Amino acid sequence: MSNHRILHTMLRVGDLDKSIEFYTQVMGMSLLRKNENTEYKYTLAFLGYGDESQGAVIELTYNWGVADYEKGNAYGHIAIGVDDIYATCDTIKAAGGIVTREPGPVKGGTTHIAFVKDPDGYMIELIQNKQAHAGLEG
């Protein structure tokens, strides 16, 4: 299993263009590729901070004609490591993004985190890079 790795996380979105704009303009990702499947009526967009060969990416799936999805209570969040969580949140807010939990240490711990909401309501956790490798330590 040494060659196994996570390739992508798929999120269903109601407005693909709006979601691509959020992940590129607000979160600083690049649109890596986009393709349509006319037979099954969906469009996929893959976004990330680097080439897919270098790490996991986000797959946005737009099912034609579906504007909203029931997210249920099982989904938690996507986590992204950032170099300066405070500056990153300032940049996200300046670009029109919604920070739902301001940056700061986890209650009872020292790891600095923040949360951001994407246009479809998916939560994104930001973790200070120097602490990201250790997880949420106390």
UniProtKB/Swiss-Prot annotation:
Protein name: Probable lactoylglutathione lyase
SUPFAM superfamilies the record matches: Glyoxalase/Bleomycin resistance protein/Dihydroxybiphenyl dioxygenase
Keywords: Lyase, Metal-binding, Nickel
GO molecular function: lactoylglutathione lyase activity; metal ion binding
Domain VOC positions: 5-129
Pathway membership, UniProt: Secondary metabolite metabolism; methylglyoxal degradation; (R)-lactate from methylglyoxal: step 1/2
Cofactor note: Binds 1 nickel ion per subunit.
Species this protein is from: Vibrio cholerae serotype O1 (strain ATCC 39315 / El Tor Inaba N16961)
Function as written in the Swiss-Prot or TrEMBL entry: Catalyzes the conversion of hemimercaptal, formed from methylglyoxal and glutathione, to S-lactoylglutathione.
A Gene Ontology biological process term: methylglyoxal catabolic process to D-lactate via S-lactoyl-glutathione
